[in-house]
Amino acid sequence: MTSLYTTLNLTMSIPVVAVALLAAWRLRGPERRRWLIGVGGALLILMILTAVFDNIMISAGLVAYDDSLTSGIRLGVAPIEDFAYAVAAAVFVPSVWALLTASPRVGAEVGSPTVSGRGDALLTRAPEPGDDDEVRTPERPGTPGLLTTLFWSSRPVSWVNTAAPFALAYFLATGGFDLVGVIGTIFFLVPYNLAMYGINDVFDYESDLRNPRKGGVEGSVLERSRHTATLVASAVTTVPFLVYLVLTGTVESSLWLAASAFAVIAYSAKGLRFKEIPFLDSLTSAFHFVSPAIVGWTIAGAELTGGVWACLIAFMLWGAASQAFGAVQDVRFDREADLKSVATVLGARAAVWFALACYVAAVVVLLAAAPWPASGAAFAILPYLATVAAYVGVTDADAERTNEGWKRFLVLNMLAGFCVTQIVLWSVLVWS
């Protein structure tokens, strides 16, 4: 029988494998060689460090593992499962960075068809007299298959950001994993993201055409002919999971699941468009990532105590801050498309300060109200604070330069997730 710790590692390795396969397919020539060298070097260093520090801490009695929760395979006295995090970090971080900095797979020259992305739903056009240089008009040539389009639209780099909150909350509440935990994790890993980002890509089509950063890992430009198929695929892949989670869950978890599904639709869908209501846009975006944790906790029948609420509120503040900072880079394009956001209303500089305030508030809530070791997650917020603080002088005119900081978030999210995962594992495997 597979141990609990091993099962958790295998579940959380799914997005790592997905991103690695994506990098292997996407990268070519020197870029692939640099990626392989980066992965190999990071893997060697992290494996050595993990072996050394795990053996030291376990031998010193600082950490102890219940043998019934591990496979029993050890390197020295360190359980083999501990090395999964070294492997995940060594593979995932270089892969994400390589994808962010990769050159377009299809070259473009003046007077030839141009390409809008790095492998997303590729949209091509031939330049015509009088064209607006910032608007890309899609045509059918070069359009990828439907599955490829859906894959990119689901933002595979962000899958773990919604699956991990559910999985960790469920694991923390139950101390284990069963079929409900696995099904829930799979739902929040892929179908949930396809619905969330797919709906967004359909209803943000016009503004995305004007946004040059769309078309890569930061977001796809979804060809109009794929809109109906994307909406249908979103419904078909999510409804069976929703039905299962309602039937196997509690009344409380079902209500939270319904709220989560509504927030996914309401954020982008025509007639609701919460993303165009300043401040509600930040809160709804944050709820997209907090709600899986609430569902994971309540579907296990666990109580939402004061300490749990403190963690969830801090998570909401964290997510709202990240959304507000992310909106800064799109200020000019959103205004041109007559779209409202917390950044277009406040202005770039004020939005950055708003993000900073939310991060600080999250730290305060964790340190003041969250129980140990959950309060230790406050330290995972500090790199975000440092990143955003570098842009406190930004103006609307140069707001797009915050994109560099936003790209760092893609890596910081993984590092923060790693820290939170360690806290949860230590809570269940050690302190309990």
Curated annotation (Swiss-Prot):
GO terms of biological process kind: carotenoid biosynthetic process
Pathway the protein acts in: Carotenoid biosynthesis
Q: Which reaction does it catalyse?
A: all-trans-lycopene + dimethylallyl diphosphate + H2O = dihydroisopentenyldehydrorhodopin + diphosphate; isopentenyldehydrorhodopin + dimethylallyl diphosphate + H2O = dihydrobisanhydrobacterioruberin + diphosphate
Q: What is its main location?
A: membrane
GO CC annotation:
plasma membrane
Enzyme Commission number, as recorded: 5.5.1.-, 2.5.1.150
Q: Where in the cell is it found?
A: Cell membrane
Topologically, how does it sit relative to the membrane?
Multi-pass membrane protein
- Give the matching InterPro entries: Lycopene_cyclase_dom (IPR017825), Prenyltransferase_related (IPR050475), UbiA_prenyltransferase (IPR000537), UbiA_sf (IPR044878)
Q: Could you tell me which residues belong to the region Disordered?
A: 111-140
Listed GO MF terms: intramolecular lyase activity; lycopene beta cyclase activity; transferase activity, transferring alkyl or aryl (other than methyl) groups
Q: Where is this region: Beta-cyclase?
A: 1-140
Keywords of this entry: Carotenoid biosynthesis, Cell membrane, Isomerase, Membrane, Transferase, Transmembrane, Transmembrane helix
CDD domains to which the protein is assigned, alphabetical? PT_UbiA_4 (cd13966)
* Region of interest (Elongase/hydratase), ranges: 141-432
Q: Where are the transmembrane segments?
A: 4-24, 36-56, 83-103, 170-190, 252-272, 277-297, 299-319, 350-370, 374-394, 409-429
- Subunit structure, interactors included: May form a complex with LbtA.
**Cited function:** Involved in the biosynthesis of C(50) beta-cyclic carotenoids. The enzyme acts at both ends of the substrate, and catalyzes the conversion of lycopene to the C(45) intermediate dihydroisopentenyldehydrorhodopin (DH-IDR) and the conversion of isopentenyldehydrorhodopin (IDR) to the C(50) carotenoid dihydrobisanhydrobacterioruberin (DH-BABR).
What name appears for this protein in its UniProt entry? C(50) beta-cyclic carotenoids biosynthesis protein LbtBC
From which source organism is this entry?
A: Dietzia sp. (strain CQ4)
